[in-house]
């Protein structure tokens, strides 16, 4: 049920994904979904509780984190891959205040705060927030808006442009890249 809910919230957002839709995918009655989760809001909270964990990206050299994070967004399918994508679930659910609050909590608790602790140093929280903002902006422009330069650009070219900016937040130093 959770896998189906995650995929639906990614594809349709909170407002357009329903308990009946989840039940139909799984092949059960909607009452069973309610029995297990209590409400659509609780199903949503449980479905998106995981997904923002930066743990895997924090493994490896600190000097390569910007590139690893850029790739995490840019190598995803352009559009819907059919599975759970916490970035797209957040973007598509943001118009609903309660859903946005739940996602914001998850993002802060599972991504921004752990990343800030890992980054350390001056203004670590702001730097972690800026990294998250950049990643969400990339995901939004590439997968939702489908802006031509980002949606059709070569992954390696985009990573080469984005990674130094993200790395500057990791290092706590202004980016030295200049547009050409």
Question: Predicted regions span which residues?
Answer:
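Amphipathic alpha-helical segments used for helix-helix packing
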Residues: 48, 78-110
